Amino acid sequence: VGFKAGVKDYKLTYYTPDYETKDTDILAAFRVSPQPGVPPEEAGAAVAAESSTGTWTTVWTDGLTSLDRYKGRCYHIEPVAGEENQYIAYVAYPLDLFEEGSVTNMFTSIVGNVFGFKALRALRLEDLRIPPAYAKTFQGPPHGIQVERDKLNKYGRPLLGCTIKPKLGLSAKNYGRAVYECLRGGLDFTKDDENVNSQPFMRWRDRFLFCAEAIYKAQAETGEIKGHYLNATAGTCEEMIKRAVFARELGVPIVMHDYLTGGFTANTSLAHYCRDNGLLLHIHRAMHAVIDRQKNHGIHFRVLAKALRMSGGDHIHSGTVVGKLEGEREITLGFVDLLRDDFIEKDRSRGIYFTQDWVSLPGVLPVASGGIHVWHMPALTEIFGDDSVLQFGGGTLGHPWGNAPGAVANRVALEACVQARNEGRDLAREGNEIIREASKWSPELAAA
């Protein structure tokens, strides 16, 4: 058979409905919206081709490799219920297409090029199945949930945090003071805002020093281990590591990184440094909505969450669930479990397209943050359970009596909810009552 040039249909090569997926394949679920007149099989096959071995035409060099061994395959297509001309295309990628231990390379391959494809109106990556063989090439979170609890000596309850506000404009000294008040009042952690890096009004080194002072003072006075997420995010990887090194020299327990704006390569480097040096790593997802907000285009956050667990982080922001729609709650809990658990069953009602086995990669604590306050505490305790970080920014600093009483109010509310739950009370039904009872004993909570 001679070599035959020319453009050909992708589906002839890349649509293989009878393919049996291998345990080592990376599986992807894409939400495909084809252009009018493009059949779904062709659209699904085009995605498989462009994100693996294909190009728009047959090339002579195809004969020098084994396409069967290296090509992505669209092995199943199903229409999306209730949506016109929208399909879920399942694609299987051979493991050899990806560099070991590189989230960066995985994304470059799977989502690098296909999203601008002419034959598609829109494309969204809904889920990825990471095979154990690939997961094992990643270090993952620097420490994970269990090690973090042992380091902090805090068990049987969610952890409490607070983002220091106003996020921009405070001097380092005043910033450290706010940190001290919150930790002294009863929080476990305070947090640099994601856009606090090293600006003219507060350089990073000054902030690190005053926050460390606040941590040590609060620890001495409360007898509890405290932390402040020192944001090490910087303009270069070298500068980021320099800040992490300084944090380690100060002896603080945790640093922070913006993993999407900072990039996966920088994040993985920082995660490796953190494991080697006993630092916990808090991850903020600034920029995620740019990627995950559109329902029919982009990447679903559950994929970004899986990628973070592979790249490495001990905490990650994951939405609050409270006050959102019922469906959102199930979807959010789906990726919260993907972050924490070792083995997660496929469950389409929670948006989980594939069974995921993490083979003992450490878990990540989900962080609920943004617009929550003490009256949400029962719901948050019930929804997220013990393995979570609950962050009240304005909900702490907005207390009429100040920061420390705001922290006291949150801690009292949390302890009351945990105690009530352990006594078998129904937090969903009696939540407000539980908070009201607790506020009889805590003027700070009553004032909140």
Curated annotation (Swiss-Prot):
What EC number(s) does the entry state?
4.1.1.39
User: Which portions of this protein are annotated as coiled-coil regions?
Assistant: none
Isomerase as a keyword of this entry, yes or no, is: no
Superkingdom classification of source: Eukaryota
Top EC group: lyase
Q: Where is this site: Transition state stabilizer?
A: 324
Q: Which reaction does it catalyse?
A: 2 (2R)-3-phosphoglycerate + 2 H(+) = D-ribulose 1,5-bisphosphate + CO2 + H2O; D-ribulose 1,5-bisphosphate + O2 = 2-phosphoglycolate + (2R)-3-phosphoglycerate + 2 H(+)
Q: Which InterPro entries match?
A: RuBisCO, RuBisCo_large_chain_AS, RuBisCO_lsu_C, RuBisCO_lsu_C_sf, RuBisCO_lsu_fd_N, RuBisCO_lsu_N_sf, RuBisCO_lsuI
- Which residues of this UniProt protein bind substrate? 113, 163, 167, 285, 317, 369
Main location, first listed in the record: plastid
Q: Name one GO biological process term.
A: photorespiration
**Record PTM N6,N6,N6-trimethyllysine, positions in chain:** 4
Which GO CC annotations does the UniProt entry carry?
A: chloroplast
Q: Which cofactor does it need?
A: Mg(2+)
Query: Keywords, A to Z?
Result: Calvin cycle, Carbon dioxide fixation, Chloroplast, Disulfide bond, Lyase, Magnesium, Metal-binding, Methylation, Monooxygenase, Oxidoreductase, Photorespiration, Photosynthesis, Plastid
Comment on bound cofactor: Binds 1 Mg(2+) ion per subunit.
Record-annotated active site: 165 (proton acceptor), 284 (proton acceptor)
Gene Ontology terms for molecular function:
magnesium ion binding; monooxygenase activity; ribulose-bisphosphate carboxylase activity
Q: What does this protein do?
A: RuBisCO catalyzes two reactions: the carboxylation of D-ribulose 1,5-bisphosphate, the primary event in carbon dioxide fixation, as well as the oxidative fragmentation of the pentose substrate in the photorespiration process. Both reactions occur simultaneously and in competition at the same active site.
Miscellaneous section:
The basic functional RuBisCO is composed of a large chain homodimer in a 'head-to-tail' conformation. In form I RuBisCO this homodimer is arranged in a barrel-like tetramer with the small subunits forming a tetrameric 'cap' on each end of the 'barrel'.
Instruction: Please describe the quaternary structure of this protein.
Output: Heterohexadecamer of 8 large chains and 8 small chains; disulfide-linked. The disulfide link is formed within the large subunit homodimers.
The entry sums up its family as follows: Belongs to the RuBisCO large chain family. Type I subfamily.
Q: From the Swiss-Prot or TrEMBL record, give the protein name.
A: Ribulose bisphosphate carboxylase large chain
What broad taxonomic lineage does this protein's source fall under? Eukaryota, Viridiplantae, Streptophyta, Embryophyta, Tracheophyta
